[in-house]
């Protein structure tokens, strides 16, 4: 009898320590997209955090919110059939100014779901978060989204899980993780084609990240690694994803103040969007599948890309060392040219590409180094004639050191395969280039390339 009572006491103790659920309906949320439930959802989050953590449950229904703020040990769970809709009014979003210094934190920013200096946070379930981003338009050429709401934004946070949910229609970037550690993103579906700067995923100066089973369709870049502060993106693996984009499917850049180290990317399908009714930015078939850029003085090293299948894109592979030299805060000059050293790209199959070609380029005195490409098959439109070559070569002769890096920055390239300039120890193995139409260009054009 004593043993039974002792066992029961252990069971009750275990049950009492289980994290509780905090249903947003109990805190006043209403399934009605005409009425705000921001305060109710925030009350549930605050109560959960005050109790030491637990699960904030969004039940089946449609809920309208402005900015909400996640806290440590909170698990935001969206039931199947549950949707959190972002308000279409800017006044429903609370501007915040983090103390973390980066290019994108110099001003106040707004976001639908925000977290700064939190740990052990999960967002999952089988529901949807929809930012209704079409309500927020780009107001100026210099507007990079600071005045429009991000959907998810985490800064200086650790142990984050984003799993199984659907994310739609952000006013800016869909997911921005800045200076965060230990992130897992698994089974997330993204549709982000509402307005300008509609990236699918931005990892910015993050460490120890696993991204897997992501399916994304974005008007702007797909899976993007950035470095808008001196903190590198480091120790990141991305695998088993399907990416559709009008811009760059897998991109390291554009901001590269710190750089990228120990990046492994594998088993990626790049394909056109199912929905081609509108292109806000970029091209319907996409600009590039693999874009590795270093233009703001950082370092890019030990990057491995393997087993990529591409349907479309204008210029499948783009590796660029430039010197835009933009600092990560106002008044800070970048005085050094960056470095690209140690890239392997293997087992890439490309079909239906544009005629531009691929490029691997450094700058005079600053070569890209140790670039190995093997087992690459590219089939594209071709069609370049001898009459077109003088203009093509004239465009490519311009180094464009300070220009924004883009795979199409020179237009059609002098090579139908790879245009390589200012490079050391670049190795090609088993490269196949085929064109639909006759094309007079050589497969490879190399300028200032040495062992």
Name the predicted role of every residue range.
Residues 8, 18-451:
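Extracellular/periplasmic carbohydrate-active domains that bind, remodel
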């Amino acid at each position: 009898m004593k043993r039974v009572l002792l066992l029961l006491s252990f069971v009750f103790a275990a049950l009492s320590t289980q994290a509780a659920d905090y249903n947003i309906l109990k805190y006043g949320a209403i399934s009605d997209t005409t009425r705000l439930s921001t305060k109710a959802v925030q009350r549930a989050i605050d109560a959960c955090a005050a109790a030491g953590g637990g699960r904030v449950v969004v039940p089946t229904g449609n809920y309208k919110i402005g900015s909400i703020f996640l806290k440590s040990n909170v698990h935001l769970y969206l039931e199947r059939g549950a949707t959190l809709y972002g308000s279409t009014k800017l006044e429903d979003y609370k501007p915040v100014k983090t103390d973390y210094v980066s290019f994108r934190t110099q001003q106040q920013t707004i976001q639908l779901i925000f977290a700064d200096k939190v740990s052990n946070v999960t967002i999952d379930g089988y529901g949807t978060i929809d930012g209704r981003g079409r309500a927020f338009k780009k107001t100026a050429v210099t507007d990079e989204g600071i005045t429009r709401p991000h959907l998810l934004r985490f800064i200086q946070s650790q142990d984050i899980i984003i799993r199984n949910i659907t994310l739609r229609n952000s006013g800016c970037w869909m997911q921005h993780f800045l200076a965060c550690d230990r992130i897992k993103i698994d089974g997330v579906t993204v549709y982000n084609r509402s307005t300008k700067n509609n990236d699918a995923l931005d990892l910015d100066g993050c460490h120890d990240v696993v991204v897997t089973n992501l399916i994304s369709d974005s008007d702007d870049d797909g899976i993007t690694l950035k470095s808008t502060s001196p903190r590198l993106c480091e120790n990141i693996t991305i695998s088993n994803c399907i990416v559709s984009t009008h811009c760059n499917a897998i991109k390291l850049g554009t901001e590269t103040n710190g750089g990228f180290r120990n990046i492994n990317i594998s088993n990626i399908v790049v394909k056109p969007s199912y929905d081609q009714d509108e292109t806000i930015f970029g091209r319907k078939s996409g600009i590039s599948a693999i874009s590795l850029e270093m233009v703001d003085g950082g370092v890019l090293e030990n990057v491995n890309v393997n087993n990529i299948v591409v349907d479309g894109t204008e210029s499948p592979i783009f590796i660029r060392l430039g010197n835009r030299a933009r600092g990560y805060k106002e008044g800070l000059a970048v005085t050094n040219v960056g470095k690209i050293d140690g890239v392997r790209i293997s087992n890439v199959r490309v079909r239906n590409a544009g005629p531009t070609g691929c490029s691997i380029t450094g700058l005079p005195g600053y070569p890209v180094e140790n670039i190995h490409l093997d087992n690459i098959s590219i089939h594209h439109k071709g069609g370049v004639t001898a009459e077109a070559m003088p203009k093509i070569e004239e465009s490519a002769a311009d180094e464009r050191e300070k220009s924004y890096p883009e795979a199409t920055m020179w237009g059609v390239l002098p090579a139908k395969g790879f245009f390589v300039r200012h490079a050391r120890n670049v190795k090609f193995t088993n490269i196949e280039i085929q064109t639909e139409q006759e094309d007079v260009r050589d497969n490879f054009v190399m300028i200032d390339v040495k062992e």
